[in-house]
């Protein structure tokens, strides 16, 4: 990917957001709330159990795609067993139309194309809307987007912590990370501090199919 300044990338994302408009299929406010609960729970399970063998393309954007796709599925006994979960302390089940269940298989890829794969920048450019750069505006399941020049990175705001995948893994490190906001705000590498004064922190994004 060609190198962009953070300011240039922000302008590009803003312009694409204006051109994109609202998705044809969305979740209503109640569905959006339940989706967030499942999305966060599935991301938490990747931290607790390690990445699911059903999760392909394990990186920061892959975590978002996987959690969104699994959140939109029917969470029956077969699904629970496949994901190592019991039926205790789960969010309520999502009542969705067939079109809504396919939302995370039909990401906007640009140029009128849709499909199950998008990278980090296309997740925010074509499939999310900017909320702002103040973390007080973030809701659980919102995305924190960073531009580091040659690379772009996503983290998930979990409500009380932040989850992400580093983009690489080894036999002794599955790449999953969870940090508190306090930890991130005092990070030695200041490029990752989610503060309005940090030009590498582009902002908080919300999946476009969520109505709130």
UniProtKB/Swiss-Prot annotation:
Keywords: Signal. Pfam families: DUF1175. This is Uncharacterized protein PA4490. It comes from Pseudomonas aeruginosa (strain ATCC 15692 / DSM 22644 / CIP 104116 / JCM 14847 / LMG 12228 / 1C / PRS 101 / PAO1). The keyword Cell cycle does not apply. To E.coli YfaT and T.maritima TM0986. Residues 1-21 form the signal peptide. It comes from the Bacteria. Gene3D superfamilies: endopeptidase domain like (from Nostoc punctiforme).
């Amino acid at each position: 990917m060609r190198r962009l300044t953070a300011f240039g990338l922000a302008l590009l994302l803003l312009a694409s957001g204006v051109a994109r408009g609202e998705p044809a299929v969305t979740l209503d406010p109640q569905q959006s709330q339940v989706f967030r609960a499942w999305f966060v729970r599935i991301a938490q399970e990747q931290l607790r159990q390690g990445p699911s063998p059903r999760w392909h393309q394990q990186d920061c954007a892959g975590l978002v795609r996987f959690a969104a796709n699994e959140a939109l599925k029917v969470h029956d006994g077969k699904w629970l067993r496949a994901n190592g979960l019991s039926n205790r302390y789960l969010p309520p089940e999502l009542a969705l139309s067939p079109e809504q269940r396919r939302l995370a298989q039909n990401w906007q890829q640009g140029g009128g194309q849709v499909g199950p794969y998008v990278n980090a920048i296309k997740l925010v450019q074509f499939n999310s809307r900017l909320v702002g750069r103040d973390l007080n505006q973030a809701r659980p399941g919102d995305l924190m987007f960073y531009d580091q020049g040659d690379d772009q990175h996503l983290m998930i705001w979990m409500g009380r912590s932040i989850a992400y995948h580093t983009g690489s893994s080894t036999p002794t490190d599955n790449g999953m990370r969870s940090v508190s906001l306090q930890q991130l705000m005092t990070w030695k590498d200041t490029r990752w501090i989610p503060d309005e004064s940090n030009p590498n922190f582009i902002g908080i994004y919300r999946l476009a199919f969520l109505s709130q």
